[in-house]
């Protein structure tokens, strides 16, 4: 869906199908996980990574009111994020909706410092964190700006 958007296919039928699917899978209390919203009539818990990714994918295609609960969930989880992947997708998702992060440098430093006890993070995770740090308009808008030559 992100690739379709960046390539100019936001109005394509497949993109619209993806929007409907993502909105259908949004948890009633906000956020997304990796599949269904409930199992055995129990609402599942959202995950920061998938919530950030879904918010990034949906920006400009749904209203802010449609995702307000998910943005609130992600903001409430920020203080607990300790891995490059979770912090990166949360940051990208929030930046896409023009949300700012409090003390982002400290959060990144905290995540990177954990390597001392956990060992080095993989290159892909660190690269995603670096990308999130530099895409203050979110991933889709940043890539669209690059394509149009309007990069900062």
Where are the regions that the model predicts?
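Protein-protein interaction modules outside structured cores
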Residues: 108-109
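Amphipathic alpha-helical segments of tetratricopeptide repeats
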Residues: 24, 75-76, 112-113
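An alpha-helical repeat/solenoid feature that recognizes helix-turn-helix modules
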Residues: 1-20, 28-69, 77-104, 117-152
């Amino acid at each position: 869906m992100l690739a379709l958007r960046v390539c100019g296919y936001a109005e394509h039928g497949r993109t619209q199908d993806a929007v409907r699917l993502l909105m259908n899978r949004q948890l009633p209390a906000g956020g997304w996980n990796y599949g269904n919203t409930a199992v055995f009539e129990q609402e599942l818990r959202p995950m920061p990574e998938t919530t950030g990714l879904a918010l990034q994918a949906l920006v400009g295609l749904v209203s802010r009111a449609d995702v307000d609960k998910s943005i609130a969930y992600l903001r409430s989880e920020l203080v607990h994020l300790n891995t490059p992947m979770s912090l990166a997708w949360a940051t990208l998702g929030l930046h896409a909706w023009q949300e700012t992060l409090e003390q982002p440098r400290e959060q990144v430093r905290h995540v990177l410092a954990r390597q001392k006890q956990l060992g080095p993070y993989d290159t892909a995770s660190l690269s995603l964190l670096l990308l999130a740090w530099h895409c203050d308009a979110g991933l889709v808008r940043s890539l669209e700006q690059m394509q149009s030559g309007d990069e900062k």
